Swiss-Prot record:
<dbReference type="InterPro" id="IPR023186">
    <property type="entry name" value="IUNH"/>
</dbReference>
<dbReference type="InterPro" id="IPR001910">
    <property type="entry name" value="Inosine/uridine_hydrolase_dom"/>
</dbReference>
<dbReference type="GO" id="GO:0005829">
    <property type="term" value="C:cytosol"/>
</dbReference>
<keyword id="KW-0326">Glycosidase</keyword>
<protein>
    <recommendedName>
        <fullName>Non-specific ribonucleoside hydrolase RihC</fullName>
        <ecNumber>3.2.-.-</ecNumber>
    </recommendedName>
</protein>
<comment type="similarity">
    <text>Belongs to the IUNH family. RihC subfamily.</text>
</comment>
<comment type="function">
    <text>Hydrolyzes both purine and pyrimidine ribonucleosides with a broad-substrate specificity.</text>
</comment>
<dbReference type="InterPro" id="IPR022976">
    <property type="entry name" value="Nucleosid_hydro_RihC_nonspecif"/>
</dbReference>
<dbReference type="Pfam" id="PF01156">
    <property type="entry name" value="IU_nuc_hydro"/>
</dbReference>
<dbReference type="GO" id="GO:0008477">
    <property type="term" value="F:purine nucleosidase activity"/>
</dbReference>
<dbReference type="GO" id="GO:0006144">
    <property type="term" value="P:purine nucleobase metabolic process"/>
</dbReference>
<dbReference type="InterPro" id="IPR036452">
    <property type="entry name" value="Ribo_hydro-like"/>
</dbReference>
<dbReference type="GO" id="GO:0006206">
    <property type="term" value="P:pyrimidine nucleobase metabolic process"/>
</dbReference>
<dbReference type="GO" id="GO:0006152">
    <property type="term" value="P:purine nucleoside catabolic process"/>
</dbReference>
<keyword id="KW-0378">Hydrolase</keyword>
<feature type="active site">
    <location>
        <position position="235"/>
    </location>
</feature>
Length: 306
């Protein structure tokens, strides 16, 4: 199968990010042209190291650029309590000498977009700081972005504060800018990602699959978004799944605003499902997931990996 969708992946590895990177690399429908890292689950130095370790593990020559170390206006609040201090606890990766590109992520994204023969798809599975910096410094790049598919937000409850999802809450100002940008946005938030559970039976079969399965199984043992006994949530994989299998998702066009001021609500995505605010829709919001179909696709894409 010839890859037909050219993508750039912005990520903050992160254990579920590792699974998403595997899918982006090995799904035959996708052509991953650049990875950029951002501070989120852990510091940007750690997310960059983790992404480089994964690329070395897979012997991949995909270019990687390090991105923003802090949110636009706020100090970083990370999720080491979910992913471990390193961001990818549980597997001993082999040492390597690979380094990131000698330019920041938003410039690397600009360069790839502006040299592409046609608009490309951005996939963001961490805080949206790098995407906001791109749009702030190079607004003309928006014409070269086919769409932005992101893991973030929620139409209901949060997972970082009572109402805010982690990726949006880490940098609400960046997210607010992105949702106001006019880009075509597909939002895979907690409404679907909390459904994207890999069952204990599925997890137990991973080590026999291949090297990638063994590595991910080791990481999942240290992942705190679920457990090996009850199943683990694959938040970030949903964004990759939508690219390849959009029919697994139920989407609704909605106006989405990001709260930046509230003492208790900063980072909340206000998803106007019923159109009460009278604003034009600015995102396609995923609200339901075919869980069985998702698991089947995950098994298929992991089997493509070495």
């Amino acid at each position: 199968m010839t890859a037909s969708l050219h993508i750039i992946l912005d990520t903050d590895p992160g254990i579920d990010d590792a699974a998403a990177i595997a899918a982006a690399l090995f799904a035959p429908q996708l052509d991953l042209q650049l990875i950029t890292t951002v501070a989120g689950n852990v510091s940007v130095e750690k997310t960059t190291r983790n992404a480089l370790q994964l690329l070395h593990f897979w012997n991949s020559d995909i270019p990687l650029a390090q991105g923003a170390a802090t949110p636009l206006l706020r100090p970083l609040r990370d999720a080491a309590y979910v992913h471990g201090e390193s961001g990818m606890e549980g597997y001993d990766f082999v040492d390597h000498q690979r380094q990131p590109l000698a330019k920041p992520a938003f410039i690397a994204i600009r360069d790839v977009l502006m040299n592409a023969p046609e608009p490309m798809t951005l996939v963001a599975i961490g805080p949206l700081t790098n995407i906001a910096l791109l749009l702030m410094h190079y607004p003309e790049c928006a014409c070269n972005i086919h769409r932005l598919v992101l893991m973030g937000g929620s139409a209901g409850r949060g997972n970082f504060t009572p109402n805010a999802e982690f990726n949006i809450a880490v940098d609400p100002e960046a997210a607010a800018l992105v949702f106001r940008s006019g880009l075509e946005i597909v939002m895979c938030g907690l409404d679907v990602t909390n459904q994207a559970m890999l069952s204990p039976d599925f997890l137990n079969k991973l080590p026999a699959l291949n090297r990638t399965g063994k590595m991910l199984h080791s990481l999942f043992n240290h992942y705190r978004s679920g457990s090996m006994r009850t199943g683990v949530r694959m938040h970030d994989l949903c964004a990759i799944a939508w690219l390849v299998r959009p029919e697994l998702f139920t989407l609704q066009s909605c106006f989405v605003a990001v709260e930046t001021q509230g003492q208790y609500t900063a980072g909340t995505t206000v998803v106007d499902i019923e159109g009460r605010l009278g604003q034009p829709a600015n995102a396609q919001v995923a609200l339901a997931l075919d869980v069985d179909g998702f698991r089947q696709w995950v098994a298929e894409v992991f089997a493509y990996a070495p």
